[in-house]
């Protein structure tokens, strides 16, 4: 007797990987091509993955929203909204805003590192740790640039360096991956559910009182564009509505930014100025980094150890959430194998925090996942 081995034939959809880009094609159901460099897989636009205009547009709007919040946090934490400090630095209000904007732009550039290095997540801040960071920094007075008293900046540099070191240790040793794999399913479910609850609480407690109608309508619009089955079916039949659906929460964001001030008058109408914005990397290096201020004293590092450990513990839940989200999404994507490696993700977070601690200490710090609002 002859035994016949039946091979399961995979049906490849028509038009799969037939375009000019990316130059390096992937086989159906396989991992995206990349250049293996240690734990990383370098993927370059147009070579290893195609360019998506819809995702670029969504990223621009979402990035600008966080840019504004990050710039405000930087200015208030480092005393850049104080007239005396503005005068001591030799700027006007617009000048210090551009200096603070430089922090946000460098952080936004670092958002590209996960995609570049093969980490299949959209990065963000360590948002739940922000109140702890601000409380830690309150031990030191606001910087006084006229006298050179900048202990708070030294403390922020030390804290972010220790957070970066935590990510490095957990990623390089593999402990981070083992911990993520060891988390029981019940706790994973709690983390996934908790991320959504945290985002909702943040929106309704912090932002609802300021603009209740705007927030309520924007939330309903987001749910409609993301989860409504009727709209999803309509998007499959219309190229225009498919593009709109692929923008995620951007339509709701545009409503809040543009239409809400006109129709509801709950928030001021934004003033848009077109043109190139000059940044102040030189001034940031001189006044906020080890290259201009010198290395922080060891006392700052000792004081920052508890806050750094607490920050990593908070960020750890994002690794668990990222793994579960990627696993769930992959089940609906038979065309591609997506691999989330917690060790690699830890190392990418190390690089982002290390870069920011050296060149523009970032108060919200750099987390592995964009998980809360």
Describe the residue ranges of each PLM region.
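Membrane-embedded helical hairpins/re-entrant loop segments and their flanking transmembrane helices
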Residues: 41-60, 76-112, 309-373
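Transmembrane alpha-helical segments of multi-pass membrane transport proteins and ion-pumping complexes
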Residues: 63-83, 104-116, 159-173, 189-199, ...
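Membrane-embedded alpha-helical modules
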Residues: 150-266
């Amino acid at each position: 007797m002859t035994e016949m081995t039946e091979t399961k034939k995979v049906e490849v959809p028509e038009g799969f990987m037939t375009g000019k880009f990316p130059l390096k094609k992937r086989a159906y159901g396989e991992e995206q091509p990349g250049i293996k460099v240690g734990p990383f897989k370098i993927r370059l636009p147009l070579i290893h993955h195609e360019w998506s205009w819809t995702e670029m547009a969504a990223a621009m709007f979402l990035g600008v929203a966080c840019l504004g919040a990050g710039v405000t946090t930087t200015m208030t934490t480092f005393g850049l909204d104080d007239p005396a400090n503005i005068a001591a630095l030799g700027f006007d209000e617009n000048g210090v805003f551009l200096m603070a904007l430089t922090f946000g732009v460098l952080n936004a550039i670092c958002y590209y590192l996960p995609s570049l290095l093969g980490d299949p997540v959209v990065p963000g801040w360590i948002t739940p740790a922000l109140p702890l960071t601000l409380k830690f920094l309150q031990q030191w007075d606001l910087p006084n640039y006229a006298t050179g008293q900048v202990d708070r900046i030294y403390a922020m540099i030390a804290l972010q360096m220790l957070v970066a070191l935590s990510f490095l240790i957990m990623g390089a040793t593999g402990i981070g991956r083992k911990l993520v794999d060891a988390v029981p399913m019940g706790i994973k479910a709690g983390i996934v559910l908790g991320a959504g609850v945290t985002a909702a609480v943040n929106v309704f407690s912090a932002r609802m009182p300021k603009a209740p109608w705007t927030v309520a309508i924007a939330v309903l619009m987001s749910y409609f564009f993301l989860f409504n089955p009727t709209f999803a079916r309509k998007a499959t039949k219309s190229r225009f509505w498919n593009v709109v659906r692929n923008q995620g929460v951007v339509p709701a964001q545009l409503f809040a930014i543009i239409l809400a001030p006109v129709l509801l008058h709950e928030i001021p109408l934004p003033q848009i100025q077109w043109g190139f914005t000059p940044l102040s990397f030189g001034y940031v290096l001189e006044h906020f980094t080890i290259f201009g201020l010198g290395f922080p004293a060891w006392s700052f590092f000792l004081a920052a150890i508890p806050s750094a450990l607490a920050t990593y513990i908070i960020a750890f839940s994002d690794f668990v959430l990222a793994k579960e989200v990627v696993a769930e999404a992959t089940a609906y994507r038979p065309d591609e194998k997506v691999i989330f490696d917690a060790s690699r993700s830890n190392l990418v977070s190390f690089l982002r925090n290390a870069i920011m601690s050296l060149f523009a200490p970032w108060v919200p710090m750099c987390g592995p996942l964009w998980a809360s609002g």
